[in-house]
């Protein structure tokens, strides 16, 4: 009988043999022009960004992450990478290759870094390190800047015999309640980098020994299919296609099926709202990403919790809901919910605010950075307060509209992809 350790070793030798000589997966992105954003941010800001990029012209940059689809990181890179190209930087986006075991381990690491009590065994560490070692072998080329996104590829640099260029680690989640054993394991690899990027200064752990730390919140692309303007007729057609009535109140949460996003709590909140607003509908939209093996299990749990209430709609990319459809549902909604228990930032909140929608969201992590309480939405604690605020907004359309208008302007000033591009250019120049 084979031991677990031997099975792991045989499995990874097989993967390495199959992939030796290959490269990391290169993600192709559609071209973008910075000039297309003139009407949104103004000519002066466009010129400022181009001037900032002059000293970086011809520099080679690569972004490395775990998936090309699903989740906020992939969405950000699909806009950021082509805009970096447009200002004269030679930039690539590459995705690591790994086994299902690896993604199960990194999901546990992700949960542990957000405070969940998860096992973290010697075998799990071995799976993590073997995959990072494999990806170091697949990583080819020389770059002036290498940007590593999140924990999955953080140890690639550990196996690099000769470090060339500046290596930057970008952390997208909230580690303030991280399990100590998991944080210590990851920290040793973070500290090999030249710089690290966090969403909030509160996310920077006191024991992190790294000279260069940048605070850069994420951002959205206002011209992407997920955020661009849509005609009312198109919105109506998309929503009705999924058997949601656009003429009745709609509350929506867009997030993965994940315990941290608390879809079960959202359903409980909706049931409280329905006692007051009888015709309300709930839409839960998720993208099922290939680095999220826990997603299916939690989808089934959510479906069981929803029961046979035909006013609860569980939608995902697997039944044809893509970026355009998410856009339409956000625009058709009366209130957007984000009832996360932990949230590094929550791009879907910024997306909703950009569409002029009031947001009711949990007062956790990076959410208060976006939701200015009582001005662009409501920050809430428990399910009862969440339901109370949703009912308030459904019954007072004037307040809802006022919050939505304020929210859009707040995003224009703080959370557009052009600001994120500028932040990266400043960081590269500083290194």
Segments (PLM) and residue ranges:
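Short acidic/histidine- and often glycine-rich active-site loop of Leloir-type glycosyltransferases
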Residues: 207, 364-374, 378-380
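Short glycine/serine-rich donor-binding loops of glycosyltransferases
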Residues: 346-349, 367
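Conserved donor-binding/catalytic core segment of Leloir-type glycosyltransferases
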Residues: 62, 239-261, 267, 282-283
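Aromatic "clamp/platform" in nucleotide-sugar-dependent glycosyltransferases that forms part
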Residues: 341
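Short hydrophobic beta-strand element within catalytic cores of glycosyltransferases
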Residues: 349, 358-361, 371
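Nucleotide-activated donor-binding/catalytic signature segment of Leloir-type glycosyltransferases, i.e.
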Residues: 286, 290-328
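Conserved acidic donor-binding segment of nucleotide-sugar-dependent glycosyltransferases
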Residues: 373-384, 392-397
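A short, well-ordered alpha-helix in the C-terminal region of glycosyltransferases
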Residues: 392, 399-413, 420-426
């Amino acid at each position: 009988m084979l031991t677990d350790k031997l099975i792991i070793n045989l499995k990874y030798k097989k993967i390495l043999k199959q992939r030796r000589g290959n490269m990391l997966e290169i993600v192709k992105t559609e071209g973008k022009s910075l000039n297309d954003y003139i009407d949104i941010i103004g000519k002066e800001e466009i010129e400022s960004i181009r001037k900032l990029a002059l000293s970086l012209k011809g520099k080679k940059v690569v972004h490395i992450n775990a998936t090309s689809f699903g989740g906020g990181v992939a969405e950000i890179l699909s806009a950021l990478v082509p805009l970096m190209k447009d200002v004269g930087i030679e930039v690539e986006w590459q995705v690591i290759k790994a086994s299902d075991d690896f993604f199960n381990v990194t999901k546990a690491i992700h949960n542990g870094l957000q405070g969940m009590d998860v096992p973290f065994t010697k075998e799990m560490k071995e799976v993590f390190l073997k995959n990072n070692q494999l990806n170091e072998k697949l990583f080819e080329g020389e770059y002036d800047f290498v940007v590593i996104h999140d924990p999955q590829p953080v140890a690639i640099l550990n196996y690099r015999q000769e470090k060339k260029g500046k290596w930057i680690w970008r952390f997208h989640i909230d580690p303030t309640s991280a399990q100590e054993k998991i944080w210590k394991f990851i920290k040793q690899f973070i500290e090999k980098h030249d710089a690290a990027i966090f969403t909030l200064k509160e996310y920077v752990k006191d024991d992190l020994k790294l000279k260069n730390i940048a605070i850069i919140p994420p951002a959205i692309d206002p011209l992407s299919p997920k955020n661009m303007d849509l005609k009312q007729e198109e919105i109506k057609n998309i929503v009705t296609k999924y058997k949601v009535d656009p003429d009745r109140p709609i509350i929506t949460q867009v997030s993965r099926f994940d315990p941290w996003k608390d879809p079960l709590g959202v359903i409980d909140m909706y049931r409280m709202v329905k006692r007051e607003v009888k015709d309300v509908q709930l839409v839960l939209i998720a993208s099922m990403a290939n680095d999220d093996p826990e997603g299916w299990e939690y989808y089934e749990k959510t479906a069981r919790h929803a029961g046979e209430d035909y006013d609860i709609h569980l939608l995902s990319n697997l039944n044809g809901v893509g970026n355009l459809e998410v856009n339409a549902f956000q625009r058709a909604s009366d209130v957007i919910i984000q009832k996360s228990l932990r949230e590094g930032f929550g791009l879907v909140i910024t997306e909703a605010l950009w569409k002029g929608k009031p947001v009711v969201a949990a007062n956790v992590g990076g959410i208060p950075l976006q939701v200015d309480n009582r001005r662009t939405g409501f920050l809430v604690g428990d399910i009862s307060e969440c339901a109370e605020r949703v009912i308030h907004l459904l019954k007072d359309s004037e307040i809802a509209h006022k919050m939505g208008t304020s929210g859009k302007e707040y995003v224009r000033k703080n959370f557009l992809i052009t600001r994120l591009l500028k932040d990266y250019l400043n960081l590269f120049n500083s290194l």
